[in-house]
Amino acid sequence: MDCRLLNEKSRIFVNADPYFVSDYVNQHVGSHCIRLPKSGCPEASLNHSTFGSLDLCRISYGGSVRVTSPGLETCYHLQVLLKGHCLWRGYGLEHYFSPGELLLINPDDRADLTYSEDCEKFIVKLPSVVLDRACSESYWHKPSEGIRFTTRHNLQQLDGFINLLGLVCDEAEHTNSMPRVQEYYTGIIATKLLEMLSSNVSRETFSEGCPSFERVVQFIEDNLKQSISLERLAELALMSPRSLYTLFEKHAGTTPKNYIRNRKLECIRARLSDPNANVRSVTEMALDYGFFHTGRFAENYRSTFGELPSDTLRRRKMKWLDPEESLPPLP
């Protein structure tokens, strides 16, 4: 498959021990285990870049490697086959993915994948809160069990999507990319996935309650650093607190309290990732957004984004180091 997704600016490993690459992927992209062939010495390569809430990864293990994962928990994986093939096993079925196909792994899906020796993939890690937000902003209905996509997709049927991924990669490797641009592109990717891929989301917009919900959401956005009471939101929506819960369940698939917390966490992550933002400490940032129990804040952050806030801040600082100094040592 001929496409340009991440270049040498994002290179982390070249001709490296697959276990070194796997350890790095476990930290940044998703929890998994690998099993190498008994013979031969595969050499793995990895390009990786962050872009707002997204992690972008181009990976090859250089051998017939089996990759298993019990589940991603808080994120989705979009895996685009670039070279070779990849055997997927799940739900009693098997399928050989080839270049031009897209494998989508839901947060609670078990993964069992076997790479061919020449297999190369491009992977996008997308937090579930980003998709939830795109769903609520479009006034679509998210099922209570969460958003789930079908597994197999053909990129030829997803008009312009590979070009969108290319634009995101170019922007991610641009050192002066602005957080607002990152959030804009991230939202487009999430909305495009909901529009183009088969899922359990009902895309019928709800005619009743939308003005009230939009008014409440805008108030939340304008007051994220303030204490927001459910009574105030119910007053804005011109309804009872009980009806407010129903409104949020219908349009956001969650409770008002969880919605507010997730928006605060998303804003904090954006600030921690922004090289131009003045961030003195994670604790100060948490307190600024009303998280007074820092231990609970860190746990909420990790359960939402798959990493601690200190990890996000540390990765931002790494980008400003000399490129050779910021790379992990090769084996």
UniProtKB/Swiss-Prot annotation:
<dbReference type="GO" id="GO:0009056">
    <property type="term" value="P:catabolic process"/>
</dbReference>
<keyword id="KW-0963">Cytoplasm</keyword>
<dbReference type="GO" id="GO:0003700">
    <property type="term" value="F:DNA-binding transcription factor activity"/>
</dbReference>
<dbReference type="InterPro" id="IPR018060">
    <property type="entry name" value="HTH_AraC"/>
</dbReference>
<dbReference type="InterPro" id="IPR050204">
    <property type="entry name" value="AraC_XylS_family_regulators"/>
</dbReference>
<dbReference type="Pfam" id="PF12833">
    <property type="entry name" value="HTH_18"/>
</dbReference>
<keyword id="KW-0238">DNA-binding</keyword>
<dbReference type="InterPro" id="IPR035418">
    <property type="entry name" value="AraC-bd_2"/>
</dbReference>
<keyword id="KW-0804">Transcription</keyword>
<dbReference type="InterPro" id="IPR018062">
    <property type="entry name" value="HTH_AraC-typ_CS"/>
</dbReference>
<protein>
    <recommendedName>
        <fullName>XylDLEGF operon transcriptional activator 3</fullName>
    </recommendedName>
</protein>
<keyword id="KW-0805">Transcription regulation</keyword>
<feature type="DNA-binding region" description="H-T-H motif">
    <location>
        <begin position="282"/>
        <end position="305"/>
    </location>
</feature>
<feature type="domain" description="HTH araC/xylS-type">
    <location>
        <begin position="214"/>
        <end position="315"/>
    </location>
</feature>
<keyword id="KW-0010">Activator</keyword>
<dbReference type="InterPro" id="IPR009057">
    <property type="entry name" value="Homeodomain-like_sf"/>
</dbReference>
<keyword id="KW-0058">Aromatic hydrocarbons catabolism</keyword>
<dbReference type="GO" id="GO:0009893">
    <property type="term" value="P:positive regulation of metabolic process"/>
</dbReference>
<comment type="function">
    <text>Regulatory protein of the TOL plasmid xyl operons. XylS activates the xylXYZLTEGFJQKIH operon required for the degradation of toluene, m-xylene and p-xylene.</text>
</comment>
<keyword id="KW-0614">Plasmid</keyword>
<dbReference type="GO" id="GO:0043565">
    <property type="term" value="F:sequence-specific DNA binding"/>
</dbReference>
<dbReference type="GO" id="GO:0005737">
    <property type="term" value="C:cytoplasm"/>
</dbReference>
<dbReference type="Pfam" id="PF14525">
    <property type="entry name" value="AraC_binding_2"/>
</dbReference>
<feature type="DNA-binding region" description="H-T-H motif">
    <location>
        <begin position="231"/>
        <end position="252"/>
    </location>
</feature>
